[in-house]
């Protein structure tokens, strides 16, 4: 086998981490005579001013593509010079962001230039050090080590953990190569950490994982209910869409903390943590008792309402008030607000999903939408907001815990269908589901899984209860990490590191929260020997000996055609999309978009998307995806919190996004000097002012936060925005998950990151000095 050669050099662009300037530094900065453009200004002063820019930053062409950070899926104009991206601006008429971008989007290109990019394969040597190697050795080592583990311990002894941040085509190829070619039964994505509860909730209630909305619904609602999400910080462009709403909507925020979003709400329900389910059952009970429900819709389009109505009778207002901390008067006011709204939309994100009862909580919101008929119309819906840029693509096409295109591994007809479409034997397709993420971790702890392949995610930072996660990685016989950076907490512990291209350095598609398929383009060259994930998967298939199975998967565009065929007849059917060019011309296209019928079946014309598509919502026809076309009311009694506060650990820790400028584990965003300066670099903990006074804690004092699993040191942020008895630490810091408690929703197996008991106290003078 020949080695892979490359003549791409790595630019040396080392960044220096600086503190935010004080007044003196700022004055010096403003008066300095030597900056990055000083020479250009002196030599060619006539080229500056009146909007002119120096030649090296002047574009000669522009293209547009979708952002690679969150699930909003904004359109960005990327300005090119000599075929390489030099800067970007938001697309003014892209139907998602309408000319807006958050700080992360503005900095999307700059994070590609970091000096810790993975530029060549690295293999751990006999001294335990990661040392450069060639691609031939790297690919051969991958094959030989994983095959040896399978031969000794069985096929199920190796697994992979994937992501929601590579292209859909890459996800599909990865899952297919691993499961159909390499016999890796077990593979899951980090989307398990953010969206699994919403997926299960939708599947059980609607019959398919189908977020029903379009972003235009933010602007068409007259009542907007936001649950467990701080849109101002986590999804700022979505908050901008709400701000554009011309109907002066009532905005109800359900969140224990007085977040930036809660401050802007017309009603803030500062509930007791994890009392959401009780709250929504109580609201349903009031709506039913007052007759504020859509009986016609319920009778014609749903099942199991009578049992649900009987269930919520167990949640009278006085008991709900006692459990949630929301007084009866406010409960009735919220119910009346929902009743009076003509277009009511219910939105939720991680505060619901990342819970030990996330599925049922999400379904309690779906129940409210169904019983009031607020679905399938503009400005309505039970709407889950996704986290990662391509979590929706992962949910449908990653071939991890579900067969490609929303099919089922355990369904023989589905296996035969996919095998026929891929021209492979159905025997190659597993007839059982993968272990979910937490069970893969458990399998490693029990010695059942010996080899792990991690792609574009950082579990050593992000997985719940880091002490357990670190123990897991140390028990592996072989760990492969495939990433664009060599410095992630997980990559540094790899036995083999495969350098990957990032967003903007490859092609493919993403699917955003509103089901919009958007285009990813190659506008920059990956550094060194880094390759696209698609290319790496193809090479690994070749080295493994299963490359012929994927001979039709020649490139992302060809793979998109394969996925179109797989989607046919499914709720996510997008066979009506002609090609990448049409996606580009239309400003993205939402699924479903089936191909135009022909012949006798052409009674109804297909949707016309020849011009720019603004948005389409699901269930306008009142038909759901269960066999009988009806939606289901699903419910059960709330569970007790697994680890409530105690005498030793009297505070409840919540985690979440702390800044609009940082993203997940900061793998990319920490590379931007601008983004670093927009967020606290030191770990901080929010604590209520009364609690701080009682504990003797002052603002900015260093404190110790401790749980049963670990302890961290942080700076205290004393505030009234968090209620007494609760503390908050942002998820972006590596130490945060040293505290969290590993427990999971029983249906989705999604981790519950937002509830564990901790203590907090100031550091002693001796501890501070050391």
Q: Where do the PLM segments sit?
A:
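N-terminal export/assembly segments and adjacent metallocofactor-ligating motifs
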Residues: 1-290, 308, 314, 319, ...
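Conserved short loop/turn motifs at secondary-structure junctions
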Residues: 159-167, 323-326, 349-356, 388, ...
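Extended redox/cofactor-interaction regions of prokaryotic respiratory oxidoreductases
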Residues: 172-254, 277-281, 369-492, 501-508, ...
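Flexible glycine/proline-enriched surface loops and loop-helix/loop-strand junctions
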Residues: 224, 264-265, 315-318, 347-352, ...
């Amino acid at each position: 086998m020949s080695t892979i050669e490359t003549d791409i050099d790595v630019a040396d662009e080392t960044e220096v981490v600086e503190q935010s300037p004080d007044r003196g530094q700022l004055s010096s900065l403003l008066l300095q005579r030597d900056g990055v453009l000083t020479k250009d200004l002196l030599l060619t002063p006539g080229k500056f001013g009146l909007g002119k820019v120096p030649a090296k930053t002047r574009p000669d062409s522009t293209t547009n593509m979708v952002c690679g950070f969150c699930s909003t899926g904004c359109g960005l104009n990327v300005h090119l010079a000599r075929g390489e991206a030099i800067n970007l601006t938001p697309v003014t008429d892209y139907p998602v962001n309408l000319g807006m971008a958050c700080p992360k989007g503005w900095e999307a290109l700059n994070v590609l230039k970091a000096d810790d990019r993975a530029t060549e394969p690295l293999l751990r040597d006999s001294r335990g050090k990661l040392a450069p190697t060639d691609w031939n050795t790297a690919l051969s080592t991958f094959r030989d080590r994983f095959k040896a583990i399978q031969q000794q311990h069985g096929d199920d002894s190796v697994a992979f953990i994937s992501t929601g941040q590579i292209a859909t085509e890459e996800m599909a190829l990865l899952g297919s190569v691993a499961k159909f070619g390499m016999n890796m039964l077990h593979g899951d994505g980090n989307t398990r950490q953010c969206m699994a509860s919403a997926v299960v909730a939708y599947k059980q209630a609607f019959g398919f994982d189908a977020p029903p909305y379009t972003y235009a619904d933010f602007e068409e609602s007259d009542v907007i209910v936001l649950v467990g999400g701080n849109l101002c910080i986590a999804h700022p462009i979505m908050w901008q869409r709400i701000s554009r709403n011309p109907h002066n909507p009532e905005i109800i925020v359900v969140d224990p903390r007085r977040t930036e979003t809660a401050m802007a709400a017309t009603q803030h329900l500062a509930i007791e943590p994890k009392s959401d389910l009780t709250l929504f059952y109580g609201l349903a009970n009031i709506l039913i008792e007052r007759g504020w429900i859509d009986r016609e819709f319920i009778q014609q389009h749903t099942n199991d309402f009578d049992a649900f109505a009987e269930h919520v009778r167990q949640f009278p207002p006085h008991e709900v008030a006692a459990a949630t901390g929301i007084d009866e008067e406010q409960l009735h006011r919220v119910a009346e607000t929902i009743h009076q709204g003509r277009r009511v939309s219910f939105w939720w994100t991680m505060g619901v999903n990342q819970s030990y009862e996330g599925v049922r909580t999400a379904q309690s919101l779906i129940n409210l939408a169904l019983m009031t008929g607020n679905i399938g119309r503009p400005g309505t819906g039970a709407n889950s907001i996704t986290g990662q840029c391509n979590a929706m693509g992962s949910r449908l096409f990653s071939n991890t815990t579900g067969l490609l295109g929303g099919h089922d591994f355990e369904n023989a007809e589905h296996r035969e269908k996919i095998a026929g479409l891929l021209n492979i034997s159905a025997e190659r397709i597993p007839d059982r589901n993968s272990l979910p993420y937490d069970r893969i971790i458990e399998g490693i702890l029990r010695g059942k899984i010996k080899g792990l392949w991690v792609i574009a995610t950082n579990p050593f930072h992000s997985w719940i209860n880091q002490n357990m996660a670190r123990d897991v990685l140390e028990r592996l016989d072989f760990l492969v990490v495939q990433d664009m950076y060599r410095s992630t907490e997980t990559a540094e512990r790899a036995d083999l590191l495969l350098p990957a291209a990032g967003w903007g350095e490859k092609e493919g598609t993403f699917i955003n929260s509103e089901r919009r398929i958007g285009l990813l383009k190659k506008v920059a060259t990956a550094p060194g020997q880094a390759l696209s994930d698609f290319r790496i998967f193809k090479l690994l298939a070749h080295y493994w000996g299963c490359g012929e199975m994927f001979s039709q998967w020649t490139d992302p565009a060809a793979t998109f055609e394969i996925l179109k065929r797989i989607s046919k007849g499914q709720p996510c059917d997008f066979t009506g999309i002609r090609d990448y060019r049409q996606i580009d011309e239309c400003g993205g296209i939402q699924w479903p978009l089936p191909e135009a019928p022909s012949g006798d079946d052409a009674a109804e014309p297909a949707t016309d998307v020849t011009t720019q598509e603004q948005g389409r919502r699901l269930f306008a026809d009142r038909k759901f995806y269960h066999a009988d076309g009806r939606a289901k009311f699903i419910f059960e009694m709330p569970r007790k919190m697994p680890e409530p506060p105690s005498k030793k650990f009297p505070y409840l820790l919540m985690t979440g996004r702390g800044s609009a400028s940082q993203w997940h584990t900061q793998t990319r965003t920490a590379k931007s000097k601008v983004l670093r300066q927009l967020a606290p670099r030191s770990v901080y903990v929010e604590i209520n002012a009364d609690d701080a006074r009682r504990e003797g804690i002052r603002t900015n004092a260093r404190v110790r936060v401790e749980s049963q699993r670990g302890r961290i040191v942080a700076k205290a942020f004393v505030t009234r925005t968090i209620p007494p008895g609760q503390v908050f630490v942002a998820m972006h810091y590596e130490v945060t998950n040293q505290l969290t408690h590993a427990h999971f929703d029983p249906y989705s197996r999604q981790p519950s990151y937002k509830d564990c008991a901790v203590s907090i106290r100031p550091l002693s003078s001796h501890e501070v000095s050391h």
